[in-house]
Amino acid sequence: MAARNPFSPTFGASPPVLAGRDDLLDDLDDALEAGPAHPDYTTLLIGGRGTGKTVMLNEVEGLARRRGWLTLSETASTPGLIDRLERGVRRSLRQILDGPQRRIRSVTAGGFGLEFEATAKSDAPLELREALVVLGDVLASNGTGLLITLDELQSGEPGEIREFGTVLQHVTRREQRPIAFIGAALPQIEDSLLADDSATFLQRCARYDIERLDNEAARIAIAEPIERHGATIDADALDLAVAATSGYPFMVQLVGFHSWKTSTDPLSGINSADVAAGIDEAERLIGRLVLSPTWRSLSEVDQRFLLAMATDSGESRLGEIADRLGVSRSYVSVYRHRLIKAGMILPKGRGRVAFAHRSARSWLRNRAEYTQERLTDG
């Protein structure tokens, strides 16, 4: 029977080894311990596709549950966010109160005991703020809390996000109830919702940039799962794998998974040939799962900028990109900023940029050839 592949190349799935994130998790755990006055009690995690934002939400939810907290997880990009949050909070209340009309003095729910007296005021369903006030008071009486996590904030309906923020501003920040919030978003949120003067709650949240892993963290994230499953990877193969990931946690999982899968017998050792084949498959998937959706979200000028970069063999100079596009240096600087936010390129010193993903250049060149062929055939 083949040894089980230890890697998890699925968006949002927690990896077998979470490397390079201990300091951030410690900070957020400290915030849950400290309470609503802590600046990180309401936090935004900002990072590009494949950097592990959703995994971090999963991990913080785990920290909260280990403290005996309730958790409520939602995706902001799906319409009806406020309705779903209201239903989730009311459901938590029903579980604790054992029925909205029932007068009770003690109940055990979610592993903790509560001593209180509560009576619903009316038959009407509680709206989000009212429900959070009641739930927050119940949880505070027992020294616990509720953690709300929202993913894909950059794609949320602005009106709903503002409404949610207004509620949390009152319930958590002003009234100091134990309702913590962690949101995750792509960097574009800084030019949209976070630039909206009416979204003051989000603007006041603590912010953490979810950066790429350094080489040592990527090395640990690849080598440790292999070793834990009784397999080995030789030093050259590991170096090759680490370089191919560009520090992206999702790419770490893809390279690890397909290197293991390609190997005839991982328990006898994964070699450089296995890793090279695994990288080929991982880069194909990164093109489909990360580069292609990002490309479709870009403007025509953004796309032309990237195609102009793809003609270089290494780092690109903004002046040369401007010449290729026939525009001014100041003009391309605007799109440089946009593409950094989109997670497609990285700044590399004064006037220079590079692709964020190692495979982006070949992916773009293939796309340019395909587009040219279609134009020629047409």
PLM feature spans:
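Winged-helix-like regulatory helical subdomains adjacent to P-loop NTPase cores
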Residues: Q253-V327
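Short amphipathic alpha-helical interaction segments
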Residues: G159, L325-A342
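Short, amphipathic alpha-helical interaction segments positioned at domain boundaries
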Residues: R358-G378
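A short, basic N-terminal segment
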Residues: M1-T43, R91, D98-G99, R173, ...
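Conserved Walker B catalytic segment
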Residues: K121-P187, A195-D196
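Helix-loop-helix "sensor" segment of P-loop NTPases
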Residues: R173, I189-A243, V255, T264-L267
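Walker A/P-loop nucleotide-binding motif
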Residues: H38-E59
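Conserved catalytic segments around the Walker B and adjacent sensor/switch elements
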Residues: N58-G80
